[in-house]
From Swiss-Prot:
Family designation: Belongs to the TrpA family.
Job of this protein: The alpha subunit is responsible for the aldol cleavage of indoleglycerol phosphate to indole and glyceraldehyde 3-phosphate.
CDD domains xref list: Tryptophan_synthase_alpha
Gene that encodes it: trpA
Protein known as: Tryptophan synthase alpha chain
Active-site positions on this chain: E47, D58
Length: 257
């Protein structure tokens, strides 16, 4: 069964734009408003980060957002309960470290997720080899377990991951944490083009994407982008008009590969 998320991101004319927000940054009561605003801005899907005290993959902007959410006593369960009432029509993606999921309990987590518009799951600290901790519970659901692949992964590993991939492949564009960047690795284009050539699902570039130029660059070699730190910062600074205009422009970028 092809997952809903794959179908949504596989549109070939325009680059898929997925935005990341930290769930509960600014309080849980703002979550639905943020989601509806991003949907109206033309994004393809929205990643919702779950605040965690030891976020190893997060850069400073997202770490601070997580701390703000933790101060509001935001939890994974509270976010899922809020999402169960969401009116959002585009797919949502939960991005959580494994610890909050274990704490809630994997069966309960999957049960709660299925009551929401969430169609994808990213667990940055769950290695590919240990996916079986959660895949049995996801079987038969419309929830895609999305793999992250790094710049340094050997080709055999990329091929193995691509073969099993669901939803989309999250291609990490830098060696390091998330955050706004001006430059990318010299080999990033060939890496993404190779991934796209072997992947049965869309390939999206993430970590450091923060300008229209970045979106246009990656539209030459993959299917779209994930924009995180820039979105988190602009929402925090309440620059919604500026952010909305940026995202609408990003969503109009045409795929050129």
């Amino acid at each position: 069964m092809t997952k809903t998320l794959t179908n949504k991101l596989a549109e070939k004319e325009h680059a898929a734009v997925v935005t990341y927000i930290m769930g509960g940054d600014g309080g849980l009561d703002n979550l639905e408003e943020q989601l509806l605003f991003l949907e109206k801005s033309g994004v393809s899907a929205i990643e919702i980060g779950i605040p965690f005290s030891d976020p190893v993959a997060d850069g400073p902007i997202i770490q601070l957002a997580g701390l703000r959410a933790l101060k509001e006593q935001v939890s994974l369960e509270a976010i899922l309960n809020k999402l169960a009432m969401s009116k959002v029509q585009i797919p949502l993606i939960i991005m959580s470290y494994i610890n909050p999921i274990f704490h809630l309990g994997i069966p309960k987590f999957v049960e709660l997720v299925q009551k929401t518009p969430v169609k994808g799951l990213i667990i940055p600290d769950l290695p590919y080899e240990h996916q079986k901790l959660i895949t049995p519970e996801l079987q038969g659901t419309d929830i895609a377990l999305i793999p992250l692949v790094s710049l340094t992964s050997p080709k055999e590993r990329l091929e193995e991951i691509a073969k099993q991939a669901e939803g989309f492949i999250y291609a990490v564009t830098v060696n390091g944490t998330t955050g706004v960047r001006s430059e990318f690795d010299a080999h990033i284009d060939s890496h993404l083009a190779y991934l796209k050539s072997i992947s049965p699902v869309p390939v999206l570039a993430g970590f450091g994407v923060s300008s229209i130029e970045h979106v246009e660059k990656f539209a030459h070699v993959c299917d779209g982008v994930i924009i995180g730190s820039k979105v988190v910062q602009m929402l925090h600074e309440e620059k919604t008009a500026e952010l909305g205009a940026f995202l609408q422009k990003a969503a109009e970028v045409r795929i050129k590969n």
